[in-house]
UniProtKB/Swiss-Prot annotation:
Residues 313-330 have a biased composition (Basic and acidic residues). Coiled coil: none annotated. Keywords: Acetylation, B-cell activation, Chaperone, Cytoplasm, Phosphoprotein, Ubl conjugation. Residues 47-61 form the UIM domain. The gene is Igbp1. Expressed in spleen, thymus, liver and brain. Ubiquitously expressed in B lineage cell lines. Gene3D superfamilies: 6.10.250.1140, TAP42-like family. Residues 226-291 are annotated as: Interaction with MID1. This is Immunoglobulin-binding protein 1. Residues 99-203 are annotated as: Interaction with PPP2CA. The lineage of its organism: Eukaryota, Metazoa, Chordata, Craniata, Vertebrata. GO terms for biological process: B cell activation; negative regulation of apoptotic signaling pathway; positive regulation of dephosphorylation; positive regulation of transcription by RNA polymerase II. It is found in: Cytoplasm. Residues 302-312 have a biased composition (Acidic residues). Residues 223-242, 291-340 are annotated as: Disordered. It comes from Mus musculus.
Amino acid sequence: MAASEDELLLPRLPELFETSKKLLEDVEVATEPTGSRTIQDKVSKGLELLEKAAGMLSQLDLFSRNEDLEEIASTDLKYLMVPALQGALTMKQVNPSKRLDHLQRAREHFVHFLTQCHCYHVAEFQLPQTKTNSAENNTASSSMAYPNLVAMASQRQAKIERYKQKKEVEHRLSALKSAVESGQADDERVREYHLLHLRRWIAVSLEELESIDQEIKILKEKDSPREETACHSSLPEKPPMKPFILTRNKAQAKVFGTGYPSLATMTVSDWYEQHQKYGVLPDRGIAKPASADFQRAAQQQEDQEQKDEESEEKALHRMREWDDWKDTHPRGYGNRQNMG
């Protein structure tokens, strides 16, 4: 009875796979926006068919980790791509409120596909890190002061190699496609065709996982500023910092004072040259008598300073008198012309 049920399920599995694969190709080459109703209907239909196909594969138990790649039939190799197709269609879903869920679900599908291919040794590649390992690596990398330039260079080189391999695989696929789809290819060509498809999807899955991890990190950190603001607001306010005075400015204020009159009017060299010019410098402790020119210049300077002081006092006196007059005579005082 179980064998008859399997026979009824087997013919439907290729149909489900090919239909869902065709829907994914239509979505990828469509010119309409991804968020349009037509595209989203195709995405939902493809995911529904792939879910049924995955259930059938689980019931039929086509793949086992105890067997080698050579033990899998050539016609069954393509069903290893079911998780990769699920991940690709999940990435096409458009719903901003559920974007994080879609990314995590797509990541699970891609990791499942890569794990299967790694177990069967379909190609040489490094499995992506799990959530636990990635969390530990993020903690370790955050504690480092500088990024690991060697790791970044190796990642860049790995991307370049994957890109070259992907282009080579696509070129070989285009050469085998017509013969395989028309049924004219032998078993060896069919097997090579499906293996090339698997290797192409391995490269695509690795690229998608990198972009998924980056987008998940951005979405999770989007709400972190709010949490940090809440944490900062709960902390007690610190007292304001005391003003500080530079030692240099403090010492300079002691010498020159804080206002303009305290500043020096001439340097020591200027003073020395001025006194040397008029011959009033001391000679061996005995001061020379001041010359008539120097005495006359000194007297003129004193007279000028006295005149300046007197003029300043007069100007100040006039300003004070004017202020007193304005206090006792309000504006408009004495204007008797416009009285009613």
